[in-house]
Amino acid sequence: MPLETAERGGAERRPRRRRVLRWIGYLLAGLAGLVVLLAIVGATYQSVESSNDLRTHSPPGRLIEVNGYKIHLYCVGDGSPTVILESGLGDNWLSWYKVQPALAKFTRVCSYDRAGVGWSDAQPEPPHSQNIALHLHGLLNNAGVKPPYVLVGHSIGGIHVRVYQNMYPSDVVGMVLVDSSHPDQMKRYPSPLMKWVRLQRLEFKLVKLATPFGVPRFVGLCGDGPVEIRDMLRTVECQTRWAETQDAEYDDFYSAASEGRTTVGSLGSMPLVVLSHDPDKGGFPDIIGVDLAKQSEIAWGEMQEDLSHLSTRGNRVVAKGAGHGIQIDRPDLVIDTIHLVVDASRAYSVLH
């Protein structure tokens, strides 16, 4: 009798178990369907709003074809040498909005959007500094912007302009490095800082994954900046191609700096000024801690000093009151420094 009861109880539990499993299956299928629906809605929202933004805010410069792709170039002013502005990682010509109009008062000045950034088409080539220099050379040539040039590079743009000068030395007569990255910085940073660097890489990858579905756009995580250019920043920095390019640029720089792939030589006696951020303003996030931030600032300062020795006429200036974006925090200093180098480069150009 007890055996019969046990068998009957087990038989009764099996249908209940199947019903529970069936309802769990329905629930999971419903959740999967909801996720798919949200993804479709998000992707549609991203596509429509991206198109609307680009129609509303057109680029101020010209779209020049380079190797079958359109690259945005914005030139103003007259005179020689022409100042070429190279932006930092993921940045576009708008990072120079406070300095370009003033520079145009004493010479010709051009900013541009690298491939996949701003209003420029994305390109299949990896964003190595050598490829970026090659694209810039083609852009300037196709647009009829003749050398000589004074190259100005911010952050990772500092490495790009050094590589450009190394590839096309006769084109360049002066250089300004604005809180420039250093080719060896990943190896020279304090080792505990690399944990934060890896977290930043993860952040860029999450943004890249979320952007095609409109998440950063919807929650307001893209296109933040000074109010006078915020709408234009939102137009370009909420684009899917921007998130993909930013991630690719960071990955490439991390690998190149870690492996020592980006090697360039001396600038000889070329006019050179290195502008560095104010250590008291902090170029590193609070999240890494006070002690590590101090160690990182010391390492950064040493690397900035190294950059100033690239030329026998090199000079380093610490931008008081400025963080990493010196051209935003201290546009006056950036303008005066570029003016100084332009004047010095005119004499240098005659001698070379």
Regions found by a protein language model. Name each.
Residues 2-81, 105-107, 126, 224, ...:
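Alpha/beta-hydrolase fold catalytic core
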Residues 146-189:
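Conserved hydrolase catalytic core segment
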Residues 310-352:
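Catalytic active-site module of serine/aspartate enzymes centered on a nucleophile-bearing elbow/loop
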Residues 74-76, 114-152, 168:
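Active-site loop/oxyanion-hole signature of alpha/beta-hydrolase fold enzymes
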Residues 85-86, 112-114, 178, 276, ...:
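Alpha/beta-hydrolase
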Residues 176-208:
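Flexible "cap/lid" loop of the alpha/beta hydrolase fold
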Residues 69-119:
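Conserved HGGG/HGGXW glycine-rich cap/lid loop of the alpha/beta-hydrolase fold
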Residues 225-318:
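Conserved serine/cysteine hydrolase catalytic core
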